Amino acid sequence: EYDLSYPKDGWVELNVEDVLRTVRETVKSVLSNNLEIEACGITNQRETTVVWSKSTGEAIYPAIVWQDRRTHKYCNNLKLEGHEETIRNKTGLVLDPYFSATKIKWILDNVNGARDKAEEGDLLFGTIDTFLIYKLTGHQNHFTDVTNASRTMLFNIHTLEWDKELLQLFDIPKSMLPEVLSCDGNFGNLNVNNTNIPIRGVIGDQQLSLIHISEPTRLSTLS
């Protein structure tokens, strides 16, 4: 469990470095058992949003957690402007603050200098899986999987690509977004304590729970 902060009514934030530190400690603990590990995987709460600097590797704002409702007025305005059906048709999602798109936009619009840095190509976005992959591969790989991408409200579930029209609607540079791989893709190698363990599975927590029900003894993931 991680400590959440509630700076204002309806706001929910998380220090993503706490997550990274816990994951590193967990990996070190597992490695201390001298197990023969062929590969590892990552599962996560899907919509929680992190924006960080490519040049420093540090988050420019605390992670905005999936429960956060700070963008509800903006979402309501988009509904009044008639964008809800387009978003639903492209993403399969309702227009709601729950998802990542409006969280990213809020950070770009409210963190000093963020939009300029994004336009310059210095800012990266990811859900928790993407941030962990980036940090645990030594800032090498900026990837996510389809289950996490599908919860951003920016991913077209028919083309399986980031949607240009939605990126324009939310005013988010495509350069911020990770490359989308299948859940069993090659996400790079885990670099902790001089190990080189392949990361060969990334999936959202709710999707993983379905697999876990059918094969409960076979799964061990970073969560």
PLM region spans:
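Short acidic-glycine loop/turn motifs at beta-strand connectors
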Residues: 53-56, 136-140
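Active-site nucleophile and cofactor-binding loops and adjacent substrate-binding regions
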Residues: 14, 39-45, 64-67, 92-99, ...
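ATP-dependent carbohydrate kinase catalytic cores
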Residues: 141, 146-214, 218
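Glycine-rich phosphate-binding loop plus the immediately following alpha-helix
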Residues: 67-112, 152-169
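Serine residues within intrinsically disordered or low-complexity segments
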Residues: 220-223
